[in-house]
């Protein structure tokens, strides 16, 4: 019998809402568990089946922990500021706030249809002034501490978006992450956050959290700590000098030329008249490229000679000074000493321009290829014969003694570009006065509410559309001094850098959150979301958390104790002979193959990321309607390991539904008895043990496998003890909560399974008391019998002979071989 999922799911969702079943527990005597999802941006497209994978995982853990007696905080909210809503509003003439509210309502409907146990009383929305009051408050604290400052910086400007974007939002091909538009470098007044002040702590404290090693490594690389030396180079024939940071001061004897970034302050001053034109043209071209495009290792090296020379401080040799875009003004000092024999980029550059390549580490033929391994130093006077570590130490000693350099630690991490020239974001709570000073708004002036306007097109001047709203923009102080509000808004990352704190105390109008409640709930016990947020969101949130820790606002150094990245659910896609993806509506299936409708070309079927353009997005609404939410939940958890990327499959969905149908039939059709005859003892206790252990490890797929094993065992058993029927339904409940609630009541229990104590197992019943042995005559199988475990040989022989007594009639038994717990073989003549 199939159950009616639509009726059952609607019934229990109403029950949970009416009874506020998932309201966060506040019993001080219970341990706490804070399960957090990366909150979504509520797009117009709604949820796709990839979203619920992570949400189901945290929901399973939340339901499991409630049953284990924990106070569980499991909230949901909306990361609702950002470019897409604004872009949509500009394209359609709609208000981004209205569009966002509609999208949130749709997301919420979809999320509720999946039976997630969120405490909706804690819902947050980054665009709500009661929320962003505290985003702005954090900004004022950063400003007071000197961690938010204005600077004229070369930004990644995207003309089509009318805004600057952060380095992290530029793709490797030099286009914008959002929209894929060209990115150019342009100097602008910007707000910056001094994340570099926290570089060392952001690095060190990674040791304190239980995160995937791959994510930690990505953060380490992004922070990019380098230990080396600053070295001073004088420009020959002038009183000018420049500094270079190098991680390899031991290779100074091999430095044969120097390279300055095109933006370096010295370039104009040292370029000779003959080279002026070439250098100016080179700098113009470089300004059109993004940092990522400039540092792409695979691109051809380009440069321009300045006509000037530097003096190598270690041996007095003259070195030509070049300008090249592979050197960034923002890294080190915007200048490098080039050691082409032992650095890939320097070697390629030297080969293009015919510059000297002098080996200073033994090994390899540097005319043929760069040599980057270790080895004894050569051509290096007092460093000859030393290995890398010894030579670095000695070189730094020499530089410091001669006062031409010193030991230095640098970081690849840059300060965070925090302003956007757009309307749909948090206003930055700063006023610029006509006397040249700026002040932050005080707490009682917050929130500075984003004014409602239909004119949200970028101003075209590089300012945000807020610059057009003079009533809002212009202010006058009590003493008559005039001022202008800051027109830049915050990036979408602002609200998501602290939202997890607001869930703890979402309605507090006096503080970001009650310190006692923060003490009670922090850190987050499990944070689940996509690995694509490894650098941006997770690094920014850790930075803000550390600032708040220093301010005494939060009690922990780190926000998220354990992080888990779910894999991606891939859609069906098709590729042509060039490997190009073809949209599913352009594909026909015939003769057992797939063909392009327009060209007739045979196509290869292969999984790929779900996308609107490929028309392979699966909408969870359709799945819930046809199969039910419980089926979708079980299927997504059973597909494979939670962190693996796996293709979507209708067959897998049907398999999950069949399992639930079998579980329902098992409860409805089994002979359920109050007494226990012991035949299911082992499999039941194994099931409780395995499911419990696997939930702790987040091995949800193998936990479901164990539930399937139990159902199979019950179908072969004579009867199902009531205790085991109840226990099974409890184990099923985190995965398939609607049907579990229904079966729980069917078994005669009071409605509401969420807080019933989690089943326990009896260790002694995990040991099999019986074994099945085979009985053979002359090596041929004659019988299989169940006997008590560990019987003595004599007893085993006796039972074996009795079980095949008929076959032995008239035969002469020569000998009996008995192997305890395995077999009895009777040799006859």
UniProtKB/Swiss-Prot annotation:
Query: Which residue windows are coiled coil?
Result: none
Q: Which GO terms describe its cellular component?
A: cytosol
Record's subcellular location:
Cytoplasm
**Catalytic activity of the protein:** tRNA(Leu) + L-leucine + ATP = L-leucyl-tRNA(Leu) + AMP + diphosphate
Keywords of this entry:
Aminoacyl-tRNA synthetase, ATP-binding, Cytoplasm, Ligase, Nucleotide-binding, Protein biosynthesis
- Pfam families for this protein: Anticodon_1, tRNA-synt_1, tRNA-synt_1_2, tRNA-synt_1g
Q: Which GO terms describe its molecular function?
A: aminoacyl-tRNA deacylase activity; ATP binding; leucine-tRNA ligase activity
- Per the UniProt entry, the Enzyme Commission number(s) are 6.1.1.4
Signal keyword on record: no
**Source domain of life:** Bacteria
UniProt xrefs under PROSITE patterns? AA_TRNA_LIGASE_I
GO biological process terms held by the UniProt record: leucyl-tRNA aminoacylation
Keyword Amino-acid biosynthesis listed? The answer is no
Motif window: 'KMSKS' region = 609-613
Q: Which residues bind ATP?
A: 612
Q: Where is this motif: 'HIGH' region?
A: 40-51
Q: Which family does the UniProt entry place this protein in?
A: Belongs to the class-I aminoacyl-tRNA synthetase family.
Q: What is this protein called?
A: Leucine--tRNA ligase
Per the UniProt entry, what species is this protein from, by scientific name?
A: Lactococcus lactis subsp. cremoris (strain MG1363)
Classification of source organism = Bacteria, Bacillati, Bacillota, Bacilli, Lactobacillales
Instruction: Name the gene.
Output: leuS
